[in-house]
Swiss-Prot record:
Membrane spanning stretches: none
UniProt cross-references to PROSITE patterns, sorted A to Z: 4FE4S_FER_1, 4FE4S_FER_2
Residues annotated as binding [4Fe-4S] cluster 2: C42, C79, C82, C85
Pfam family, one: Fer4_8
Membrane topology: Peripheral membrane protein
Protein name stated in the entry: Anaerobic glycerol-3-phosphate dehydrogenase subunit C
Subcellular localization: Cell inner membrane
GO molecular function: 4 iron, 4 sulfur cluster binding; glycerol-3-phosphate dehydrogenase (quinone) activity; metal ion binding
Domain 4Fe-4S ferredoxin-type: 21-53, 67-99
Organism: Haemophilus influenzae (strain ATCC 51907 / DSM 11121 / KW20 / Rd)
Gene3D superfamilies: Alpha-helical ferredoxin
Gene behind the chain: glpC
Upper lineage: Bacteria, Pseudomonadati, Pseudomonadota, Gammaproteobacteria, Pasteurellales
Length: 426
């Protein structure tokens, strides 16, 4: 007993003597009232008996982890970071953040299998993979679509052979913008900055072009940050917090430079990127982004505000029946009502809001062999609702939700910006 007490005292002294510790202290777990509302809404708990749930892995586990660093748990890896636990929590405990930080600490202390570590590095370093693959996109896309390739990826890197891998674009959005759009954007008096992220840059430049089209139609020009990197979310949740922290500081610095020099807001069309840039950089990584945080926006709430200011779009009737899927991080941030109000501007459009539930992919989570079946089980009810609803499209702001829905249902998932452009072109 005396040894345990002395160990607690030594640990406390070490923390007090470390300035770095103050950045990451999160005492929200003390507010947990043990109501288990978080566990009731957790999509993983319902589908994976090995996961004890967010209450035990989060606030309950944090109390134990403060006593002994040896009490980190392998079950932490099952959390998808969907944050539905945080939405449900009546005490505003940052349950998902607690689990992500604990998981990163656990991975730092444990010996992850070499091939899994390589797999996680490949899935997490999106800029590196994008720069390698976009110049060779036609070849890469053909090779990664082969059954033999998928078989080898599962046997070597534990990437599920059942997962449809994302396709790369032949050329990046950023290079297209510099060659074809930069000069035209200078003519607009009012401007916004666009954080395009890795998905638009390497996988879907067309979505970035649609971003420009919508804002230009509102007489607003679009600038790019001088430099940007992937928001760092894949690194943050896969056990590379130091690398994620460096990227977060890099992006925060360049967002700050844009705000200081031009006094304009920075917009992202991606829900998880927006949440990460605005909230998680500080909550999880300890980055001081207080100066730039008010200037970081998700695109649909920003468009909603523009409509409130009197801005308009030349929208024409679309006689379509579409389903709106509330992505997990959209639910966490409370952005869904704004997206729905923006889409209601499209004449003749029928919008059905699907029950809010996780699609299961959770970024890189659903690509891993050990998670694939759980991922699909989590999303099954959603896929059934989509397939049985008679929809022309599913709408979502989340790119990985799009990958999951496109692969697992009979209906194509598109971004709200794409639907707005369809209406403008009708």
């Amino acid at each position: 007993m005396d040894n345990n007490i002395q160990r607690l005292i030594d640990s406390a002294k070490q923390s007090l003597n470390s300035p770095e510790s103050y950045k990451y202290i999160d005492e929200s777990f003390e507010s947990c009232i043990k109501c288990t509302a978080c566990t009731a809404v957790c999509p993983v708990s319902r589908n994976n008996p090995l996961y004890p749930g967010p209450k035990q892995s989060g606030p309950d586990g944090e109390r134990l982890r403060l006593k002994s660093a040896e009490l980190y748990d392998e079950a932490l890896k099952y959390c998808t970071n969907c944050k539905r636990c945080e939405v449900a929590c009546p005490s505003d405990v940052k349950i998902g953040d607690l689990i992500v930080r604990a998981r990163n600490n656990h991975l730092a202390q444990s010996k992850k299998p070499l091939m899994n570590k390589l797999r996680d590095a490949i899935l997490s370093n999106t800029d590196v993979m994008g720069k390698i693959n976009t110049p060779l996109a036609p070849i890469v896309n053909t090779i990664t679509g082969l059954k033999a390739t998928k078989f080898m990826l599962e046997k070597t890197l534990n990437i599920s052979k059942k997962r449809t891998l994302p396709k790369y674009a032949f050329g990046t959005f950023r290079s297209w913008y510099m060659k074809n759009a930069l000069q035209d954007q200078q003519k607009f008096e009012r401007k916004v900055a666009y954080f395009h992220g890795c998905y638009v840059n390497y996988n879907n430049p067309q979505l970035g072009k649609e971003f420009l089209k919508v804002f230009n139609a509102m007489n607003i020009g679009v600038m790019l940050l001088e430099k940007e990197k992937c928001c760092g979310l894949p690194l943050m949740v896969n056990g590379f917090p130091n690398r994620a922290r460096n990227i977060a500081q890099f992006n925060t610095d360049y967002i700050g430079k844009m705000v200081d020099e031009n006094g304009i807001d920075v917009i992202s069309e991606a829900s998880s990127c927006s949440l990460n840039l605005r909230d998680e950089y500080h909550h999880i990584l300890g980055i001081d982004n207080a100066k730039v945080r008010p200037h970081i926006h998700m695109v649909t709430p920003f468009l909603y505000q523009l409509f409130k200011e009197g801005k308009t779009l030349p929208l024409k009737p679309l006689k379509l029946r579409v389903a709106y899927h509330t992505a997990c991080h959209v639910d966490k941030a409370g952005w869904a009502p704004y997206t729905l109000e923006v889409l209601k501007k499209i004449p003749s459009l029928e919008i059905i809001m699907l029950p809010s539930q996780c699609c299961g992919i959770a970024g890189t989570y659903g690509f891993k062999s050990e998670n694939y079946e759980i991922s699909q089980s989590i999303g099954k009810n959603l896929f059934d609702n989509i397939n049985e609803g008679g929809f022309d499209y599913v709408i979502s702001e989340c790119q990985t939700c799009k990958w999951q829905i496109d692969m697992s249902s009979n209906v194509t998932c598109i971004h709200p910006l794409t639907l707005l452009c369809m209406s403008m072109d009708a």
